Amino acid sequence: YFVFYCNNKERVKMEAKRRGLQTIEPKFEMKDILSLNSLKPNVGKKKFLDFDEIENVLIKLKKDGKKIGFCSGCFDILQSGHAVFFSQCKELCDILFVSVGKDSVIRKLKGEGRPINSENNRAYLLGAMSEVDYVILGGNEILPGKIDFYNNLKKIKPDVFILNDNDSAIEEKRRACQEVGAELKLVKRNVPSFLNHTSSSVIIEELNNK
């Protein structure tokens, strides 16, 4: 067997033909974020939620007295800084909800060519992280402060909303927290010295300059 991964189906077929291989297309069809729950590996629980499922999940969590945390972002190219951030988030809560920006919204905020990875790819990678308990897609509306997650925040009403201390819209997000009764917690970007302190945007810029 030879496994060749590529988003371009025709390129895969051409490469297989060149190597004298037969192509087998997966039967799995990605319809929406909920489809990710059927992928392997998983951790025995449903991590990917749509908006209508949030309330039922919260009922049990709050009944069990769990402290709910919330964060949001693009998470385009998952890297060490993200891993450290989620670890910091989990230290402040029992259950962490992550809202990931939709492709259409990220394109509006960051321009053509972004995101590099689709919303389903980004959501799936987030769900694979042990610190992340639930993943939801952000909304279509963009409020001041580049807030595309307000409906999720309002629905979840987390105990804490965790944010990097160098975020460009801290005050706008602080007001959003006040409206839903959440405490805003700022964490410092604290990537260990032996890891590259980088970001998705920096990685993309470096690749484009090569």
For the regions a language model picked out, list residue spans one by one.
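Nucleotidyltransferase catalytic core that binds NTPs
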Residues: 1-210
